[in-house]
Structures are given as structure tokens and as C-alpha cells.
Amino acid sequence: MTEAQRHQILLEMLAQLGFVTVEKVVERLGISPATARRDINKLDESGKLKKVRNGAEAITQQRPRWTPMNLHQAQNHDEKVRIAKAASQLVNPGESVVINCGSTAFLLGREMCGKPVQIITNYLPLANYLIDQEHDSVIIMGGQYNKSQSITLSPQGSENSLYAGHWMFTSGKGLTAEGLYKTDMLTAMAEQKMLSVVGKLVVLVDSSKIGERAGMLFSRADQIDMLITGKNANPEILQQLEAQGVSIMRV
């Protein structure tokens, strides 16, 4: 029996029982305890089950991670589409834009694809899409591949400063009167290096993120040139941001 076959049977057991012990896996598959634990570890790392003491349990109500293939399933998809369309209208022919990772970033890249603009990105799903669609000018920022975010990250003191664009579009997990928050520290630090060399910083977040504070402060409010968000965004937070010079667009 191959590893793939063992994994399939193990997942079927979990679908039926909800929980299995290492002993039960050994008995059902006819393998050693060490092999059973190794299989459980691999499936846990891939997010297909949850490893627990002496066994594994099924993952319930798991929301699928979006990809360019299931982009329509992204949270607040319709609002993000409107945000991306509005953002794309800001860019003039011949300008360059920096686009980072996430569902809104991909939607923005899709809107700009085919237009006479240079797109700079470290987000591989977007880069692959642009290349596949034969977009004329794509710059892929180099670095080490980060699997969890599907991006490349350059080491400390790298040449990210060379990638200066007229516009930088980015998102985050929350936006308050203090500024934009991101939860992935490595991604945030890599992007922060570019803030001093881009022309304008535009934050793209759906209305559910307004007023939320999560992770590290990526950029202060006074560093943000424009915010594009949904019509249901907290008006009090928007007023506080406007008072600090942030231009607000609600779509």
C-alpha cells in the first residue's frame, strides 16, 4: 500500500469516526506505530486533519483557502471586486505599480492585466496569471519562497529598495485611526522597506477590516495616501483617517 493510499484510508476513517487512535490506524492499515504517526504528522502539516495526543481528529467546518481558481469564494468577494476596479482607475498609462499578496491584490492585478502599466509583485499566483495572459511588463521580486503566503521574501538588507513604483497597493488584517495592521511579520517587514521609495501608498481593505486591530502596525495613518473600502465601513474611523490627510474612496 502506497503512502497516498494510506492517507486516503486514514481520512476516510476520520470522516466516519471523527477521531482515531494511533493503535486503530496501525490495526486498520497493518503498519507500524512509527509509520502511523508519520502519516498523521504529514496530514496535520497539510491541514487535512488535526494531530492530537495518541491519535488524530477530523477538521470540521474548514473554510477552503482561496486560490485564483476559487476566487469567487473569497470573503466579501463582491466588495473586493469593486475595490479592485476603483483602484485600477487610479493608474495612468506608463506608470508602475507594486501589488502585494491576497485576494484583493489578485483582483487588482487581473483588472490591470493588458493595460500599458508595469506591474511589480512578489505574489506568485498573480505573477503566473499575468505571464499566462501575456501582460507586457511584469517584474517579479526575487527572494526566498514563502509557502504559506505564496510569495517571495528577500533577506534583510536586500535590494527591495530598487523596486520603486508610482503606486503601491496593499491590504491588511485591520485598519484603525492609528494605521494599517498586518499579521504576517515577515511579509510586513519586507513591504515596509518599500514605503520610502514608492510614490503613493493606497490601502485596499473591505469594510469588515475597518476598526480592527490585529498583528503589527505596518504603516501609520499619516503614511497612507488613500484608502479604498466598502460603503459599510465605520464612518467614525474614516473621519479620523481623513483628519490625518488620508483620501477616502467608498465603493
UniProtKB/Swiss-Prot annotation:
GO terms for cellular component: cytoplasm. Its main location: cytoplasm. SUPFAM superfamilies: NagB/RpiA/CoA transferase-like, Winged helix' DNA-binding domain. The keyword Ribosomal protein does not apply. Keywords: Cytoplasm, DNA-binding, Repressor, Transcription, Transcription regulation. The keyword Metal-binding does not apply. It is found in: Cytoplasm. One of its GO terms (molecular function) is DNA binding. Residues 3-58 form the HTH deoR-type domain. Residues 20-39 bind DNA. One of its GO terms (biological process) is negative regulation of DNA-templated transcription. Represses ulaG and the ulaABCDEF operon. PANTHER family: HTH-TYPE TRANSCRIPTIONAL REGULATOR SRLR-RELATED, HTH-TYPE TRANSCRIPTIONAL REGULATOR ULAR. This is HTH-type transcriptional regulator UlaR. It comes from Escherichia coli O127:H6 (strain E2348/69 / EPEC). The lineage of its organism: Bacteria, Pseudomonadati, Pseudomonadota, Gammaproteobacteria, Enterobacterales. The gene is ulaR.
